[in-house]
Regions:
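Compact beta-sheet-dominated domain cores in extracellular/mature segments
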Residues: 2-11, 16-135
Length: 135
């Protein structure tokens, strides 16, 4: 009886192992964490670190834990994104376009710099391109 039960249990275990799927998927990392249709900011370079994802305006990034912390971004929306140096859409602005140019690291001068995010403008005075930092 014991031998029959053990044989049955081994047979069931082998059959289950052949039926159960093996997951090889891995979690998204870096920029790939940003879902389509969102604008994402990252606290690290190249889409690393903490991430926030937005589908609309954010007048104060402090409320989202990203005030003066972002180092990279990806605009996966059809909108033009205006990044403001100060909260409540004040100070100067930099622009992140949609499409393939809307992904990357901020110029070193503008890392840990932005405090609010506005979708589709009107924008404000340009923060400019820092000398020697043309993309």
């Amino acid at each position: 009886m014991r031998k029959t039960l053990r044989t049955l249990l081994v047979s069931v275990a082998v059959a289950a192992a052949g039926v159960l799927p093996v997951s090889t998927a891995r979690a998204a990392d870096g920029y790939d964490r940003c879902p389509d249709g969102y604008y994402c900011m990252f606290s690290g370079l190249d889409g690393t670190g903490d991430m926030i994802k937005l589908r609309g305006n954010a007048p104060d990034l402090a409320a989202l834990g990203m005030d003066d912390r972002a180092k990279s971004d990806w605009n996966r929306t059809p909108s033009t994104i205006y990044l403001w140096s100060d909260a409540q859409y004040s100070g100067c602005t930099a622009v992140t376009s949609s499409g393939p140019t809307g992904k990357g690291n901020f110029f070193p001068t503008y890392q840990n710099f932005f405090s609010s995010v506005q979708f589709d403008g009107p924008g404000g005075p340009s923060c400019g391109t820092p000398p020697g930092e043309g993309r």
